[in-house]
């Protein structure tokens, strides 16, 4: 699991059927690395979240058939990132 911040929802003109219909969000780490995750919990831009990766990400998304390796597992109520 990893703690990341939601940057924005990705808008897709079309997508593979096996990606399902969950929103996709662009997330970033405290170091600026960008990730894309499925969002079954309804995050907003700026939220800090924890993510579930690898094969467990499909379970967390609610369907083992979905093509994902990263899913938002929950919104963190109070997270203070490290000061740079």
Swiss-Prot record:
Upper lineage: Bacteria, Pseudomonadati, Pseudomonadota, Gammaproteobacteria, Thiotrichales
Keyword Lipoprotein listed: no
Annotated GO CC locations: carboxysome
Complexes and interactors: Homopentamer.
Residue intervals of the BMV domain: 1-77
Recorded domain comment: The tight homopentamer forms a pore with an opening of about 3.5 Angstroms in diameter which is positively charged.
Stored NCBIfam families: carboxysome_B
Name this protein carries in UniProt: Carboxysome shell vertex protein CsoS4B
Summary of the function given for this chain in its UniProt record: Probably forms vertices in the carboxysome, a polyhedral inclusion where RuBisCO (ribulose bisphosphate carboxylase, cbbL-cbbS) is sequestered. Has been modeled to induce curvature upon insertion into an otherwise flat hexagonal layer of major carboxysome subunits.
Keywords: Bacterial microcompartment, Carbon dioxide fixation, Carboxysome
SUPFAM superfamilies: EutN/CcmL-like (SSF159133)
GO biological process annotation, one example: carbon fixation
Record organism: Hydrogenovibrio crunogenus (strain DSM 25203 / XCL-2) (Thiomicrospira crunogena)
Highest taxon listed in the record's lineage: Bacteria
InterPro entries documented for this protein: CsoS4B, EutN_CcmL, EutN_CcmL_sf
Family recorded in the similarity comment: Belongs to the CcmL/EutN family. CsoS4 subfamily.
